UniProtKB/Swiss-Prot annotation:
Basic protein that binds to cell membrane and depolarizes cardiomyocytes. It also shows lytic activities, but 2-fold less important than that of CTX-A4. It binds to the integrin alpha-V/beta-3 (ITGAV/ITGB3) with a moderate affinity. It may interact with sulfatides in the cell membrane which induces pore formation and cell internalization and is responsible for cytotoxicity in cardiomyocytes. It may also target the mitochondrial membrane and induce mitochondrial swelling and fragmentation. This is Cytotoxin 2. The keyword Secreted applies. It comes from Naja atra (Chinese cobra). GO terms for cellular component: extracellular region; membrane; other organism cell membrane. SUPFAM superfamilies: Snake toxin-like (SSF57302). Keywords: Cardiotoxin, Cytolysis, Disulfide bond, Hemolysis, Membrane, Secreted, Signal, Target cell membrane, Target membrane, Toxin. InterPro entries: Cytotoxin_Cobra, Snake_3FTx, Snake_toxin-like_sf, Snake_toxin_con_site, Toxin_cobra-type. Gene3D superfamilies: CD59. Disulfide bonds join C24-C42, C35-C59, C63-C74, C75-C80.
Amino acid sequence: MKTLLLTLVVVTIVCLDLGYTLKCNKLVPLFYKTCPAGKNLCYKMFMVSNLTVPVKRGCIDVCPKNSALVKYVCCNTDRCN
């Protein structure tokens, strides 16, 4: 009985992600990556001249400020970029 209980506890720990990890889209949204510790935001970078096509996506720790040439959109849920 103790062995069964221990097995269930181990399976639960393995199945549950005890340390939450954020998943962000790569440039092609069909693919994503798991962000490393400390990178708690997903971002999407656009050139101001063409705001419909993102040029870069990924994980980041702090959302960069927009500039005259580049716009950033940041979010904090899985695959939100």
